[in-house]
Amino acid sequence: SSLDFNDFLIMPPAYYKYGDKEVIEFYSRIIEARPDSRIILYNFEKLCGYKFSIECVKELVKKFPKQIVGVKDSSYNLYEHLKIDNFSVLPGSESKLLKGLELGCAGIITATCNVSAGLSRKVYDDFIEKKEQTANEMLCNVRNTFEKFNLISGLHSFLSDGDKIYKNVLPPISLLNEKDKQKLIEELNKLNFTLGSLKAA
């Protein structure tokens, strides 16, 4: 609270086995400590070992309608089916953006939006304005290219050619080896997706 933050993206604890009851209690404790918080749930089973059920999300929203305001869905079991008024559903991949918008999702939250934000925004704006989709294929191709490698390592390696600060990573994160880095850049170049194109956008 000393930093004056109210909005949070919070994943359930990792490394422990638990169910919906314990997850609800976990978020309840946070909200009791910070009643003015606004929380986006982070649904990412591969990282924490727990996958939100629709029932659990609905129970949390029912219990805390002002505090539980959305979910980042990186397990992709919610975004096609979860419908709650005044609640944002945000898939965790650019490849799910257009389909998610068609289903009523609010947008996306993704790591690769650090480089794909311009394309993602165009897909979003064209959907809202009912224009022809001209950027979605490239957006998905860029995302799929990064996914062929360790995604976070790939992002840092790609961006480090423009700013060496991106080489500064803490274990267990590491940069791609030189062979994989060059392969990533070559595949992105084939899509006409370069650091130069990002700066121009």
Q: What residue ranges belong to the model's regions?
A:
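Structural signal for hydrophobic packing residues in well-ordered secondary-structure cores
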Residues: R34, Y124-I128, R143, L159-Y166, ...
